[in-house]
C-alpha cells in the first residue's frame, strides 16, 4: 500500500526482436541489441520504454515514450500528447501502441493506461482508449498488452485492462512475473517500486540474453 509498482516486459517471436536487452538510461531504460551484428531493422524495436518527467513515470511499448515526455513537458495531458500517434505500421498486425503514466505526488498515487489500435485490423481508423485510475487499491494493478492471443493477423487487445494482484517485495514480484512469461518468447522485464511518500524508487531488470 505504500509503493507504486510498474512492470513492463517484451516478448519476441523473430530473431530480430529476441535479440534485445533492457539497459538503464538515466532514470529510465532503453532497449539495445544484444548482438549488434544480428540487428536487422531497429525501427520498431529500439526505443526507450521508460522515461521519468519530474514526478511522472512514463512506460510504453515504443517511441511514443518520447512523444508523451515532450507533450507533458509542454503542459499537455497524457491523452493529448498521444493524439499525434497511432498504432504501429507493421501490417497486417498493426501492433497497438500501449502506454502508461504513473503520477506520484505528496503521498498520493494515480495512474493511467492508453491503447491506440486499428479498427479490427482496418488501418484507416485508429481507436483510442485511455483508462485512468485514481487512488488505486493496495495490492491490485492493471495489466494491458498488445494482443489477446494468436492469429493471423494477431488480434489486438480488447476491453478494459485486466485486474491483477500485486504482492510481495520487489524481488518476489519480479520473479513471479518473469516465471509466468512464456519461456521461448520472453526477452526482458523491467520492474520499479516507487515509494509514494517520498518518490524514491527501486528498479529490477531481467534479461534473457546474458
Question: What spans do the regions from the language model cover?
Answer:
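Conserved short alpha-helical segments that host acidic/polar catalytic motifs at enzyme active sites
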Residues: 1-210
